[in-house]
């Protein structure tokens, strides 16, 4: 079977059970290992609520018992080395250089991130570097929420059979239909801030890390 390399990027601030559900579903559907890549402070979103090293450590804890999943710190290392923002297109250019022009590469992302892809640096270049696997998310309808300029670039690239992704190195999109999980990082952070119940959206290891390190203002909660 031709090799397939899957990368799942995100802020993971913090990593929650919804992220893990998407990664598990992709791993099961595509039968390939998945490297989860925490982003550096993203240029197109507000600064994360925890440090990059906290986010990496939480991600490592979350995937430590997940077969086929691993944490990849390359984007954090590159941002620290170059002292500038880190972009997905840079990460994929680096990965493509490492793996060569004929290797099948997938960038996994949620539908909520995909519909905002036109805010990303050089987003039109992504199909020349990778396939995109888009996981459905609650409240997102791709047919109606995709901006026209994105529809022009992507609509002819969708495939129905995921086996196509192994046969070509880049350029296709496939919809990962999984049971959408309503968890979100913003929901977790808001729940911590409001002293509401939040642990159920996280693995026990990540929840304990947040408590131990006082992230998201938890030590301010009485």
Curated annotation (Swiss-Prot):
Swiss-Prot/TrEMBL keywords: ATP-binding, NAD, Nucleotide-binding, Nucleotidyltransferase, Pyridine nucleotide biosynthesis, Transferase
Catalyzed chemical reaction(s): nicotinate beta-D-ribonucleotide + ATP + H(+) = deamido-NAD(+) + diphosphate
Top-level taxonomic group: Bacteria
GO molecular function: ATP binding; nicotinate-nucleotide adenylyltransferase activity
UniProt-listed SUPFAM superfamilies: Nucleotidylyl transferase
Listed CDD domains: NMNAT (cd02165)
Swiss-Prot/TrEMBL GO biological process terms: NAD biosynthetic process
PANTHER family (alphabetical): NICOTINATE-NUCLEOTIDE ADENYLYLTRANSFERASE-RELATED, PHOSPHOPANTETHEINE ADENYLYLTRANSFERASE
Family under the similarity heading: Belongs to the NadD family.
Biological role: Catalyzes the reversible adenylation of nicotinate mononucleotide (NaMN) to nicotinic acid adenine dinucleotide (NaAD).
Protein name: Probable nicotinate-nucleotide adenylyltransferase
């Amino acid at each position: 079977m031709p090799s397939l390399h899957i990368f799942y990027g995100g802020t993971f601030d913090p990593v929650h059970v919804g992220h893990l559900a998407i990664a598990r579903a992709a791993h099961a559907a595509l039968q390939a290992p998945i490297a989860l890549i925490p982003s550096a402070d993203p240029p197109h979103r507000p600064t994360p609520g925890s440090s990059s090293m906290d986010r990496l450590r939480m991600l490592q804890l979350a995937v430590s018992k997940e077969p086929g999943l691993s944490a990849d710190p390359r984007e954090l290392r590159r941002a620290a080395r170059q002292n500038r923002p880190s972009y997905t297109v840079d990460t994929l250019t680096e990965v493509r250089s490492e793996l060569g022009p004929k290797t099948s590469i997938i960038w996994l992302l949620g539908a909520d991130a995909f519909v905002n892809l036109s805010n990303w640096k050089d987003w039109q270049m992504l199909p020349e570097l990778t396939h995109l696997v888009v996981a459905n998310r609650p409240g997102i309808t791709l047919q109606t929420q995709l901006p026209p300029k994105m529809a022009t670039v992507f609509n002819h690239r969708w495939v129905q059979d995921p086996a196509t992704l192994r046969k070509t190195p880049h350029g296709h999109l496939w919809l990962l239909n999984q049971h959408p999980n309503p968890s979100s990082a913003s929901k977790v952070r808001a729940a911590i801030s409001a002293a509401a119940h939040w642990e159920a959206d996280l693995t026990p290891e990540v929840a304990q890390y947040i408590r131990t390190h006082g992230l998201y203002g938890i030590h301010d909660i009485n």
